[in-house]
Amino acid sequence: MSQSTAYIILNILVILAGCFITACGIYLFVNGLFHSIIGFVLGIYYLLAGVCIVLLEIVFPQKLVNLFGFYTYWFGKGALISLIGLLILGNSGFFLAAGIIVIAVGIVCMIFHFLLGCPRPLINRSVERKPEPQGQHA
């Protein structure tokens, strides 16, 4: 398998994980609206996180590279996805399955950090991480 094929497969896996996170967010948002404020807030959190993961996987604007530098590495991407997967884990079948799938995708990303270079978004594959200038502090 070539390196570009591995990038595309991992991008698709991360998009799948983002879709699971979004689905959990929609479910919790709708149910939490009437039952508990915690479910409502977690639903919004999962919804925003899932949509952002999917969008950043498709296109990663250059302006966001310095703000989300950890997301330009497979390990940072995998750690974020695994953390969200741990939060999703629940007693019901859907949340348990979604949490396990999301955690597995995160672990795969962290493993591939040591085997592949930096990830690229699906559409604008020319985005590269720019090093910060030395000697300038905000």
Curated annotation (Swiss-Prot):
Protein induction: Developmentally regulated, is also induced by heat shock and cold shock.
Location in or out of the cell: Membrane
Keywords: Membrane, Transmembrane, Transmembrane helix
Major location (coarse): membrane
Membrane topology: Multi-pass membrane protein
A Gene Ontology cellular-component term: Golgi membrane
GO aspect biological process, one term: vesicle-mediated transport
Any Pfam family the entry gives: COPI_assoc
Transmembrane segments: 12-30, 32-56, 71-90, 93-118
Listed name of the protein: Membrane protein P8A7
Source organism of the structure: Dictyostelium discoideum
